[in-house]
Amino acid sequence: MKKISIALILLISSTFFACKPKSKPTDDIKSIRFKFTELGRETQFRIACDKFDSYFPEGRVKNFTQKAGVDSVMQLLTNMQRAEEGNLPDVRGKIYITHTNSITDTVCVGVKVLNYKDAVYQTPQELLALIQK
């Protein structure tokens, strides 16, 4: 009888843990900050991600701290299509995604492609529109 009650308690507790609602990936994001220059600005050469701040130190800045704003940006970033290998962005902006554990991800944004988590994606036009708003 004692073994049955222990097994029943283990079964019930494992059921509670299995039914616990999963947190959304956007729940661990504290803020998002855009730093950008004019998207149509032409230069004689491609601006690399690590050189963006030195070429455009006075860029415009937008901050998103409200959950609705953070969710809308993250939805755009999670539904992106991969770009062809070898494409690198001509960087016109950066997105800094700060997580609740103070780790910051950087997205390097070009008009055609962007670099996020060591992968190159096609830049969503909705993201460009959001940046320019």
Q: Where are the model-predicted features located?
A:
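Function-determining sites in protein domains
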Residues: 20-133
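Sec-dependent N-terminal signal peptides
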Residues: 4-13
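C-terminal motif of bacterial Sec signal peptides marking the signal peptidase cleavage site
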Residues: 15-18
